[in-house]
Regions:
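Active-site-lining helix/loop region of Rossmann-like oxidoreductase modules
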Residues: 55-59, 63-196
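Rossmann-fold NAD(P)-binding glycine/threonine-rich loop
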Residues: 13-20, 25, 34-56
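A short hydrophobic/small-residue beta-strand
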Residues: 28-30
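Generic helix-packing signal
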Residues: 1-2, 23, 54, 73
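Short strand-turn motif at the edge of the Rossmann-like AdoMet-binding core
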Residues: 32-35, 61
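Helix N-terminus capping/helix-initiation residues
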Residues: 8, 39, 105-106
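Residue-level marker of alpha-helix boundaries and capping positions
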Residues: 9-10, 37, 172
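N-terminal glycine-/serine-/threonine-rich beta1-alpha1-beta2 phosphate-ribose binding loop
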Residues: 1-21, 153
């Protein structure tokens, strides 16, 4: 059946396997498994393919907010961009009994080590135009996925904390992430663009 846009919401592997073919078919794509774009060569190839075919790659806000504001990192001096993500050990498949830092470093490295748990880090990096700093924590006391964003620069300071509830249809995904796709789809053709 004809369509204008394809939504990838399966996995990093699915995005890597199918995104280019979607773009070559002249269709826009919404990539939810943003970790696939941590591979600079793959990302550059997709962008060039989209350009050649006059189509777009859409990255939804996913499980966070403020990607529109983080984009100022592409044009203004930034002193700090840190994402601190805290998840329950069960969601990370780790038998951890006390709060433990599992990762500290750049987003592109975190995506390689934890490909199923760091789409937020890659989304923020894409918005900022650079690989951001990431801390990944496991905490048995946390029953939700929590993302804290610390963003400082010549524009001022931003702190945001998001505690996501799981999607009722897929507990591995946050409900906010699922809703962000629906919001993006609803507004694709709107003449009023907010937060771009």
């Amino acid at each position: 059946e004809p369509c204008d846009v394809i939504v990838e919401a399966a996995s990093v592997a699915a995005a890597r396997s199918h995104a280019k073919a979607v773009l070559e078919a002249g269709k826009d794509i919404i990539i939810m498994s943003v970790g696939a774009l941590a591979d600079e060569e793959f990302k550059a190839d997709l962008i060039e393919t989209a350009r050649k075919n006059s189509v777009k790659i859409h990255i939804p806000s996913g499980a966070v907010l403020g990607l529109d504001n983080i984009k100022v990192g592409q044009i203004a001096r930034v002193d700090k961009i840190l994402l601190k993500t805290t998840k329950s050990p069960a969601s990370l498949n780790r038998p951890i009994t006390e709060k433990t830092q599992l990762f500290g470093g750049k987003a592109h490295d975190c995506v390689r080590e934890f490909p199923k748990n760091t789409n937020v880090a890659q989304s923020l990096s894409l918005a900022a135009g650079r690989s951001i700093d990431v801390e990944l924590w496991a905490d048995p006391a946390e029953d939700r996925n929590m993302h804290e964003i610390f963003f400082e620069g010549e524009f001022g300071e931003i702190y945001a904390r998001i505690r996501n509830v799981p999607s009722p249809d897929n507990p591995a995904t946050s409900y906010l992430a699922a809703l962000s796709i629906l919001s993006l789809l609803r507004n694709l053709d709107s003449p009023l663009v907010i937060g771009a």
